[in-house]
Regions:
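Sigma70-family region 2
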Residues: 12-13, 49-67, 87-88
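Amphipathic, Lys/Arg- and hydrophobic-enriched alpha-helical face
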Residues: 23-41, 58, 123, 175
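Internal acidic/polar
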Residues: 1, 82, 90-116, 143
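Structural recognition of an alpha-helix C-terminal capping motif at a helix-to-coil junction
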Residues: 32, 46-53, 66-78
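Arg/Lys-rich amphipathic alpha helix in sigma70-family domain 2
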Residues: 60-64, 74-94, 164
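A short, charge-rich alpha-helical start-of-domain segment used by transcription regulators
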Residues: 8-32
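C-terminal edge and immediately downstream basic/flexible tail or linker adjoining helix-turn-helix-like DNA-binding
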Residues: 10, 91, 149-152, 166-186
Length: 186
C-alpha cells in the first residue's frame, strides 16, 4: 500500500488512481467532520465534495509539516464555515455581550451509558449556530476569539452560544441516559 507522500506526489502529477486512493482513504473520516457542521446528509456530501476539490487544488501548498489528515480536516472545516457564512449572510453583533450568560463552566463527567455515536447524534440535533460554536470550541479546539473571527460574531456571542449549547446538551444527555450529568468542560 503506497504511503501518503507517494499518493500526494501522484495526485500532483495528475494520477486519477492516486486521487481516488486519497479520497477512499480519507472520505469516511472527513464525511464525519462534514456531518458535524451540516444540517443534513446532502449538505454534508456537498461540503465533502467541495472540500476534496479544495484539497486537490491546494495539495501543492502542503508542506509535509504536521499531520496530513489534520491539514485536510482544516480545509473541510473551513469549507463548512464558508458554506455557513454564505448561507446565513452573517454580520457582526456586538451588543449580545450585554446579555448575561448562563453558567459557562459545567463539569466533565463519565458518560459510560452513552456511545460516541449517540453523543454525536445529540450534538448534531443542536440548533445550527450553537452546534457550529460547540464543534469549533469543544471538538476543534479553537478559542472564542478565533471563532468570532471565523463566523463573524462577537466573542461574547461565541461564549453565549457555547454555554447555551452545553445547557441543551446537558438536558438531552440526561434525558437520553436518565442521569443528570454535566456536559464537556471548557
Amino acid at each position: 500500500m503506497p504511503d501518503i507522500i507517494n499518493i500526494i506526489k501522484g495526485c500532483l502529477a495528475g494520477s486519477r488512481r492516486d486521487q481516488e486512493l486519497l479520497y477512499r482513504r480519507h472520505a469516511a473520516k472527513l464525511y464525519a467532520v462534514c456531518l458535524q457542521y451540516s444540517g443534513n446528509d446532502d449538505e454534508a456530501r456537498d461540503i465533502l465534495q467541495e472540500g476534496f476539490i479544495k484539497i486537490f487544488e491546494n495539495l501543492i501548498h502542503y508542506k509535509n509539516e504536521g499531520s496530513f489528515e489534520g491539514w485536510m480536516r482544516r480545509i473541510v472545516v473551513n469549507t463548512a464555515l464558508e458554506k455557513y457564512r454564505s448561507k446565513h449572510n452573517l454580520y457582526r453583533v456586538d451588543d449580545i455581550d450585554a446579555i448575561p450568560e448562563p453558567d459557562a463552566s459545567p463539569e466533565t463527567d463519565d458518560y459510560s451509558g452513552l456511545e460516541a455515536g449517540d453523543l454525536l447524534m445529540i450534538i448534531r440535533d443542536l440548533p445550527h449556530k450553537y452546534r457550529m460554536v460547540f464543534n469549533l470550541y469543544a471538538i476543534e479546539g479553537y478559542s472564542h476569539k478565533e471563532i468570532s473571527q471565523m463566523i463573524n460574531i462577537s466573542e461574547g456571542t461565541s461564549k453565549s452560544n457555547l454555554s447555551r449549547a452545553r445547557i441543551i446538551l446537558q438536558k438531552k444527555v440526561s434525558l437520553y441516559t436518565g442521569v443528570n450529568k454535566k456536559v464537556i468542560s471548557g
